[in-house]
A protein has these predicted regions:
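Walker A/P-loop
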Residues: 35-76
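P-loop (Walker A) phosphate-binding loop of NTP-binding proteins
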Residues: 49, 83, 154
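Conserved C-terminal "switch" segment of AAA+ ATPases
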Residues: 5-9, 23, 172, 177-253, ...
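Walker B catalytic acidic pair
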Residues: 48, 114-115, 126
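C-terminal engagement/docking regions of AAA+ P-loop ATPases
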Residues: 2, 245-327
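Conserved alpha-helical scaffold flanking the Walker A/P-loop in AAA+ ATPase domains
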Residues: 33-36, 90-112
Length: 327
């Protein structure tokens, strides 16, 4: 890795940020971390109330990257086969009946799983194999998904009616969980100015599909080449152990409110996001600040809190922040 490659990575990333920023107002951190997750090779979970621009963000990313895009609207009656696809009976040119695989909407480079917590657990689980293995199995036959492949899921807060909490196994498949906050008064004014007039902002495509695919795979390769000093890695390991209630180094807050802490996959997620952040700062090595920026979005959904935490209004973000500030 040389400085020219780092600068090219930063230039491409900032182009995407700026183009998406033309249609998104006040979500700069969310845009950056969502893109960082894509280049880290992971999947993103966006949580927020309806109407905050979660779906628009995912559509804008797909449009800007020039990749194939499919949207799955999760509902209570959605079946697993509606996601992965199914075998259908068809006739060939010799009028012979055969079963043919009809791919579901999961077969795209970028898949928007909209309101994923509106569907039941069985349908939610149909995403698991696709997200982890980059393939789906239908009636005993395995089908590879197109590359690159990213799932960007949106969900409503659990307090809203008609929602099913995502199981821990599925939550762990998401590299980061981002909370989409409501806009401020000035941001809402800007949203109204941009969306209710005659002229609408247009996004430029990063490249055509073939060039974009090649660039993304190259950028992902560069991310893995970022260096991690042993001392920096030790800090990350120490922070993860401090969030485990079974560890001797856990804090009093963790001991009181945490049922299960993050596992190895959580530490991997922090590391991968930190590597992207290092490149965006023009560095070929991770700094402590990269880890401190990445740790909350990468671990907040991997913390399982007890009932006492809910009763006392203690969140995973608060617990992770305490450990982060003490490190």
């Amino acid at each position: 890795m040389n400085q020219e490659e780092i600068n090219k990575f930063k230039q491409n990333f900032e182009f995407l940020e700026n183009e998406i920023g033309k249609v998104m107002v006040g979500l700069s951190d969310t845009i950056r971390l969502t893109l960082a997750t894509i280049f880290a090779g992971g999947h993103t979970l966006l949580e927020g109330a309806p109407g905050l621009g979660k779906t628009l963000l995912v559509r804008s990313i797909a449009e800007c990257m020039g990749l194939s895009f499919k949207r799955i609207q999760f509902t209570s009656d959605l079946m697993p086969s509606d996601v992965t696809g199914t075998q259908v009976l068809s006739e060939d040119e010799n009028n012979k009946r055969t079963f043919k695989f009809q791919p579901g909407p999961i077969f795209a480079n970028i898949v928007l799983a909209d309101e994923v917590n509106r569907a039941g657990p069985k349908t939610q689980s149909s995403l698991l194999e696709a997200m982890e293995e980059k393939q789906v199995t239908v009636l005993g036959h395995t089908h590879k998904l197109p590359q690159p492949f990213f799932v960007l899921a949106t969900q409503n807060p659990i307090e809203l009616e008609g929602t099913y909490p995502l199981p821990e196994a599925q939550l762990d498949r998401f590299l980061v969980k981002l909370l989409v906050a409501p806009p401020s008064a000035s941001e809402l004014n800007e949203i109204l100015n941009r969306t209710t007039g005659q002229e609408q902002a247009k996004i430029k495509a990063f490249a055509n599909k073939e060039e974009s695919t090649k660039a993304i795979l190259q950028m992902r390769k560069l991310v893995k080449e970022v260096i991690v000093a042993p001392a920096v890695q030790d800090v990350l390991v120490s922070m993860v152990f401090s969030l485990d209630p079974n560890s001797n180094t856990c804090t009093s807050l963790v001991n009181q409110y945490v049922k299960f802490g993050p596992g190895p996959r959580g530490a991997q997620a922090v590391m991968m996001i930190s590597k992207v952040l290092a490149l965006l700062d023009g560095r070929a090595n991770i700094a402590y600040e990269d880890i401190k920026t990445a740790i909350i979005p990468a671990l907040r959904h991997r913390m399982i809190l007890n009932f006492q935490a809910e009763a006392d209004g203690v969140t995973a973000d608060k617990i992770i922040s305490e450990v982060k500030d003490a490190s």
